[in-house]
Curated annotation (Swiss-Prot):
The gene is SLY1. GO terms for biological process: protein transport; vesicle-mediated transport. InterPro entries: Sec-1-like_dom1, Sec-1-like_dom3a, Sec1-like, Sec1-like_dom2, Sec1-like_sf. Involved in vesicular transport between the endoplasmic reticulum and the Golgi. SUPFAM superfamilies: Sec1/munc18-like (SM) proteins. It comes from Encephalitozoon cuniculi (strain GB-M1) (Microsporidian parasite). Belongs to the STXBP/unc-18/SEC1 family. This is SEC1 family transport protein SLY1. The keyword Transmembrane does not apply.
């Protein structure tokens, strides 16, 4: 829903100029937004014949209008003065400042070019919609910067964009935490003063959660398809690059990806292999020779584009799964996951200390904090000659932990996985999904202990009957594992959940930021 709504809003201003052909000019921020959202073919449908970055050197196309989709007015004045295009339609990712508009107007009036600017709009679409139920702000280093007031201001504008796009004024819930409380207060004020969202009969609840609430989940080994993909290949803006060099764009409209992104890896492999088998059967049934009936030939031709798309999808996921299996074997990811989630013996720990990368062992050591085996951490790290400032951070801040799960060996049958353990957890929760479940339960019970409710409409209480959806936003970064557990919660409580965060973290990136914070102390 969120992704489609954002796309509709952007398409509306792309087609707005009364001209069948136009140029699209972006900056680095809006390129981040539009890249995973719209294909080149969709831009073509909006009449976009070419698109450029505002920082690029360009030749004049003086008889063609240009639609600008930018974060700020930087570079616009130079383009108009250079008379690159016939008309300029300016659209800002959030809102343009008065100072920028005045500066632009002054510069253009001196040359008599003010009328070239045909429209200026604040669009409030400043977020990256990766899936219909997931968005990110793409703010790199947000865990390091999450206590910076300048970072809060940028977050507020982007999170507000989500609710402008949804067309709903949120109730804002902050946990007893200074960062989320300050941000909630700023967001409430901004929504009230801007007044761009109309109140409806149902409203979303925005739950702001600091990454400091749970610093363990980002370093745990993972086992669901999207989380594992992000861990192994750094899934960035729905795009991954395999070790083989192959690059894949993961389209949320791709049925295989849409159905399986949050599934456990063994289940995904089984489904992909089954899909491949079904595709081969379909192709065999549609084989054509000189004796084939004309009607059958026509049906085959009509079906060809769909089959080609299906073939591309199956082959992509086979390639991805195959390489993931090899990396799982190489680093013994299945063993690390089993030990972290299902318990372990000392012998298993000793054996595991000789497997995986140094980063895998460091992650395991962090998971042993606050357990009966904490005394094994230093010998474990010394054995691998691992030195990291991060371990001290987790000694001080490791508090909240994901619960241990019962795990079982599944009955999944798959040849592709070979001897990789086919683990399927019995249940899975994260501290954030547990927190959200508690908050929703408190709202239903009208209990607000430890919660602060902010509302630009002035209400101090929330009733479950007026909630349209829950929007959970992670300040300082989020994970695909948390998305999975929130979607499981969605099934339990029957309320739609959208998950967003300042950035999507994997263990490597989070550990890098933890070390960065330690260096600042």
């Amino acid at each position: 829903m969120l992704r489609e709504l954002q796309k509709q809003r952007i398409k509306a201003f792309l087609v707005a100029p009364n001209n069948p052909w136009k140029i699209l000019v972006l900056d680095s921020r809006t390129q981040q937004i539009i890249g995973p959202l719209m294909k080149v073919s969709e831009l073509r449908e909006c009449g976009i014949t070419a698109h450029f970055l505002v920082t690029q050197e360009r030749h004049p196309i003086s008889n063609t209008p240009a639609v600008y989709f930018v974060e700020s007015a930087d570079g616009v004045l130079d383009d108009v003065l250079a008379e690159l295009y016939s008309e300029y339609y300016l659209n800002f990712a959030t809102s343009v400042t008065r100072g920028e508009i005045e500066s632009l107007g002054l510069g253009l009036s001196e040359r008599g070019l003010g009328l070239r600017i045909r429209s200026v709009y604040d669009q409030f679409v400043d977020f990256i919609a990766l899936q219909d139920d997931m968005f990110t702000l793409g703010m790199k280093g947000s865990f390091i910067e999450m206590e910076n007031p300048d970072t809060w201001r940028r977050m507020v504008m982007s999170v507000m964009s989500v609710f402008v796009t949804l067309g709903e004024v949120p109730f804002i819930v902050a946990t007893d935490d200074d960062v989320t409380t300050q941000m909630a207060r700023m967001l409430e004020t901004k929504i009230r003063n801007t007044g761009v969202i109309k109140r409806g009969s149902k409203r979303p609840v925005l739950v702001l959660v600091s990454r400091s609430h749970d610093v363990i989940t980002p370093v745990q080994h993972v086992w669901s398809y999207s989380a594992l993909m992000n861990d192994l290949f750094a899934l960035e803006s729905n795009k991954i690059t395999l070790k083989s060099g192959k690059v894949f764009d993961l389209d949320p409209q791709d049925e295989l990806w849409r159905r399986n992104a949050n599934e456990y890896f063994p289940v995904v492999v089984e489904r992909v292999e089954k899909e491949l088998l079904e595709y081969k059967k379909e192709m065999a049934l549609r084989s054509i020779d000189e004796k084939t009936d004309k009607k059958v030939i026509q049906e085959a031709l009509d079906k060809a584009p769909e089959l080609a798309k299906r073939n591309e999808s199956v082959n992509a996921h086979i390639s991805i799964c195959s390489e993931m299996v090899e990396m799982i074997k190489e680093r013994a990811i299945d063993d690390f996951y089993k030990v972290e989630k299902g318990g372990h013996t000392n012998q298993e720990l000793i054996e595991l200390s000789e497997k995986g990368s140094d980063e895998d062992v460091l992650r395991l050591a962090i998971l042993l904090l606050n357990t009966k085996d904490f005394d094994l951490i230093d010998p474990l790290l010394r054995k691998r000659k691992i030195k990291s400032k991060a371990i001290e951070f987790f000694r001080r801040h490791g508090g909240t932990r994901s619960e241990k799960l019962g795990t079982l060996y599944s009955q999944v049958v798959t040849s592709l996985m070979g001897n990789v353990k086919k683990l399927l957890p019995v249940k899975e929760q994260t501290p954030i999904s547990s927190l959200v479940e508690t908050i929703y339960g408190d709202i239903k019970s009208q209990i607000y202990s430890g919660l602060r409710v902010f509302d630009s409409m002035g209400s101090k209480s929330i009733y479950a009957s007026e909630i349209s959806r829950l929007v959970v936003f992670g300040v300082g970064g989020g994970t695909y594992t948390e998305l999975k557990t929130l979607k499981l919660l969605e099934e339990r409580i029957g309320v739609p959940i959208i998950y967003g965060s300042t950035e999507i973290l994997n263990a490597r990136e989070f550990l890098r930021q933890v070390e960065g914070r330690m260096s600042l102390d």
